[in-house]
C-alpha cells in the first residue's frame, strides 16, 4: 500500500517545470522541493511516455514485484485540487518510479526521455567531476601556501 501518512498538498505555489520532448507533447511537472522529487499520477506518467495507463500499471507492478523499488518508498497518496475546486486523494509516484518506468516503456517519447535523462546525468557527472577537480587543485594550492 502507498505511504499515506505522507499526505502532501500539491498547491499552485509548487514549482512547475515544463518537460517538452517534442512539439506534440508537453507536460507540466510539479516539483516538491521539500522532498526533492516530483510526483506524477499513472495517467501523467502515461502521457509523459506516450503510452496508455494500463501499460504504466503493468510496469509499476513488475517493478514492485521484482523488488527493484519498494512501493511504500516511491508512491504516496497526495491531495490535489481539481478544476472543480474539490480536493481529492490520488496515488502519485515519485521520480525514482518515473525513471524506472521510463526505462521499461517502449515508445518514441520514452526513448526521448531516456536520451534526455542520460544527457542530464552525463552533464551532471562530468561537470561535477570537473568542479571537484578544480576544488581539489585550489585546496592543494591553499595547503602549499600554508606550508610556506
Where are these regions (language model features)?
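Short Lys/Arg-enriched helix C-cap and helix-to-coil transition segments
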Residues: 68-83
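Alpha-helical DNA-recognition elements
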Residues: 62-66
Amino acid at each position: 500500500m502507498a505511504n499515506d501518512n505522507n499526505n502532501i498538498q500539491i498547491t499552485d505555489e509548487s514549482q512547475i517545470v515544463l518537460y517538452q520532448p517534442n512539439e506534440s507533447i508537453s507536460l507540466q511537472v510539479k516539483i516538491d522541493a521539500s522532498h526533492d522529487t516530483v510526483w506524477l499520477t499513472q495517467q501523467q506518467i502515461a502521457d509523459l511516455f506516450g503510452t496508455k495507463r494500463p501499460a504504466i500499471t503493468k510496469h509499476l507492478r513488475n517493478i514492485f514485484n521484482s523488488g527493484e523499488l519498494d512501493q511504500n518508498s516511491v508512491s504516496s497518496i497526495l491531495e490535489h485540487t481539481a478544476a472543480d475546486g474539490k480536493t481529492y486523494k490520488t496515488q502519485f509516484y515519485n521520480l525514482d518510479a518515473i525513471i524506472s518506468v521510463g526505462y521499461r516503456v517502449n515508445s518514441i517519447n520514452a526513448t526521448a526521455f531516456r536520451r534526455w535523462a542520460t544527457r542530464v546525468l552525463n552533464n551532471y557527472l562530468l561537470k561535477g567531476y570537473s568542479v571537484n577537480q578544480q576544488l581539489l587543485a585550489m585546496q592543494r594550492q591553499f595547503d602549499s601556501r600554508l606550508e610556506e
